[in-house]
Amino acid sequence: MDIEIMIPSDEPVRLLSAVTEELNYEKLTATYSQLGRNEYPPRLLFKVVLYGCCRGIYATREIERACRENVNFMYLLEGQRPPDHNTIARFRKEHLPYAVEELLDQMVKLLMQNGEISFEQSAVFIDGTKIEANANRYSFVWKTAVTNRQRKLGEKIAEELPKRLEASGTGIHAPCIITVRRLKKLRKGLYAKKKEQNITFVKGKGHHKPGLQKAIESITKWLKKLKRYNLDIHICGDRNSYSKTDVDATFMHMKEDHMKNGQLKPGYNVNVATVSEYIIGNYISADRTDTKTFIPFLNKLCNIHPVQRVVVDSGYESEENYRYVDGSEQLSLFVKPSNHEQKKKRKYKNDIGRRETMAYDAEKDEYTCAQGQKLREVTVKKRKSETGYIRETSVYECADCKDCPVKEKCIRQKKTDKTPLEDRVKRLYVSKYFIQQREAMEKKISTDEGILLRVNRSIQAEGVFAMIKEDMNFRRFLTRGKVNIMAEWYLVSMAYNVLKLHHKIQTGRLGNHLFALDAA
C-alpha cells in the first residue's frame, strides 16, 4: 500500500520532511560508533521525534505507538519498521543533545536564505517564561538552611571532639580548624592507635564501648554529615536552592499557582529570541529573573546572527543592561521601563515622596520637595552586583525635615526601621546614568518605530509561549538535567518553526516580518 497517497498535499508532515531533508546531519551521525551499521538512520529518528513535538506527543512510548498506528509517522519512517521506545529514548539522551542546537541554527539559516527571516526588516524579540522541571516538588535543598546546619555542626564538633579524644586516652589533640581533610587524618591516627594498643571494638547490647571506639564512631558520623553539606553547597553554586531529583533545577515561583499560596516549584527559566515570528535561539538558566539572562543571551545571539534591533519587556530593564547595549555600535535596544504604566496612574503622580514628582535643577544638581526644601547630593555609593558590575548611586539629603507637616507622606516608614520618623530626614537614592537612559528610552519607545516594535513583541515573543503551551501542549519537561532539557526545548523550538512556516504558507503570509499596527 502506498502511504503517500493517503496524506494530503497540505499536511504539515510533508513540509517537515522537506525542511529536514535540507539539513546536514554530520554532527548527529558523529555521535554514533563507527563500527557496524546503525539500526535506524539518525535522520529518520530525528524526523519522528520532531514530528511528535509538532503533534504534542513527547513520551517515547506514545511515539512508538504513533509509529505503529499513525500514517504520518509511517511516512517519515520511509518503510522502516517502527522503532521501540528504548531506541527513541537512547536517541534523545545519548545523541540528540550534542547536535540539536546546531540543527536549529541550520534551520534558521535555511529560513534566512529563503527570505523568511530578516534581521533588517524585523527585530530580535526576547521574552522568558518558567517551565516546571521533571522533579519532585518537595525535594528541595535550601542553601541557607544547609549553611546554618554546617555552622552548627562545626560548633558541635569543636565542643565535643576534645572530650571524645580525652576519653579515648590516646593523647591526640583536636585540630584548631575543623575540616573534612583534618578529620580524616585524625581518624586515621586513631585507627593506628587502635592497632598499636590491640583494642577490639564491640557492638550490640550488653557491651561497653571503649573511649577510642566512641571517638572514631563520632568522627565518622560527623564526616558523613560534613561531606553531605559540602556537596549540597557545591551543587547550589550561585543558586539558593536545588532539587534532589534534578540537581540542575531551581525552585521558583510559577505562573500556574493553583493553590494561590506562592508555592515554589523546581523549574528552569527559558528565554527565547524570535525574528519574523520564528525562534532563532534559546537560553536556559537557573536565574529566577530575566535581568541577569539578557547579556549572556545577547552575546550568544550576536556570535551567530547579525543582530541589530533588540526588543524586550520591562523585566529585562537594568542599568547593567543599558550600559552593555550603550557600549555597542551594532545594537539598538527597545525596552519598556518598569514604571511606564505605573507612572500614568493618579496615585503615582500625587506621591510627593517620589523623585519624579520633585522639581530638579540640573545646574545646581538639587531637588526641591513639595514643601520647598532643597535636597542636595551628600555622597556617592558604589555597589557591586553578583555579575561584577559596579553601580554608582548618588544620595541626596534634605537639610531640614523637622516639623514638616507632610513628613508621613514623604518618608516611607517601615516596621523594621529603628530610627523613629521624627528623627529621620528625606533621602533620595539616584543613579544618574540609569535615569538618563530611562528618560531617553521613554522617548524612543514612543516613536512610531518604538510603538510598532512593542506591539510586535507582544504578538511574536509572547505568542511563542502561548502556542507551545496551549497548541503543542508542552508545559513541563519530561527529562532531567540541563543537557537533556535543553535538547528537549530545542526540539520544541524547531517543531514550532515548522508549524509557523506551514501556517504562513496556508495563510499566504510568506515574507511578512512584522504585523502592521492596524492588523495587530
Give, region by region, the residue ranges found by the protein language model:
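A Lys/Arg-rich helix-loop hairpin that forms a DNA/phosphate-binding surface
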Residues: 36-37, 79-81
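Short domain-edge segments at the starts or junctions of modular domains/repeats
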Residues: 1-4
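Anion-binding and metal-coordination hotspots
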Residues: 49, 56-69, 80-520
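Basic, short loop/linker segments at the boundary and entry of helix-turn-helix/winged-helix-like folds
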Residues: 9-50
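Aromatic-lined, polymer-binding surfaces characteristic
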Residues: 75
